[in-house]
């Protein structure tokens, strides 16, 4: 038998369990070989499945509870006895292969189960878990999102925006309104990260700004990437919609990060400026250079934005201004009105906050 090098991609195979047959993963008598004159009693008549073909490799079966129970029996026979019968012919497998299985939480496995005999033969069980802290979560999200922030239209992501995006996920994972048995996956963070970057880049292209810098107003696009990824707790959410729950966790995330980044001392001076009737209107398509003009009546706001990030870049400063405004709203110091894609901050009506 010739010796050849297998690339690692060739030494790994996976299969989605629903609809998988015994012949797919173990093997079957090949009618074409029989027609060619090969005897049914010969091993040459066999067409081997994925597991034998992954000798000295790795085979993964996804959604294991959805695998037919008869096929699961064949799986544990290979795991323990290393043999199996194909159409009545005993076949001994001398294979060296690592078998991996994946399964979602029990709430998603209503139509199937893993038979006890197969569970007994599985060497170890690993329960996936959430990142231990926000910093690690940001690293995972940044890595898995795999977004190119450079290129013709670069994007500069402020640290507080990354922190808010990850804190949204953390808040969702701790929310009493969300079914925690189903959980909130990393896909939630990844999709939101990509959405905010795309929104900022879209603004950069439309307005000719380089680099584009994500702002709080870009979070207004999160429903497009978040809705459908949160499973509500029917007992805890009562009459709240998924959109309302999302708005609540976003507000909580902004408040949490704002209190970490911004010193409370001096905030009342900004609030007093709004108490004089000042209104500040922002949007995701407002040019960055325009932020200096719209906050001229509240110079303390402009100064506090510099404390968040001292960059002289107008786009960075615009993002900081929105961050301070959103933080003041989230901590119930000023109010906010949203209409037609624009956000107006003032002290009229009831102060916001959730």
What are these regions (language model features)?
Residues 1-4, 8-13, 17-50, 55-153, ...:
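Canonical AAA+ ATPase core
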Residues 28, 78, 168, 216-222:
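Short acidic/histidine-centered micro-motifs embedded in hydrophobic/aromatic stretches
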Residues 109-113, 119-182, 204-209, 232-240, ...:
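Conserved C-terminal "switch" segment of AAA+ ATPases
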Residues 48-49, 162, 185-191, 270-278:
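Amphipathic alpha-helical surface "interface" segments used
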Residues 61, 179-186:
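Short, charged/polar micro-motifs that form catalytic or ligand-binding hotspots
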Residues 163-167, 187-205:
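C-terminal helical "lid" of AAA+/P-loop NTPase domains
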Residues 96, 159-163, 183-190, 217:
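An alpha-helix initiation/capping motif
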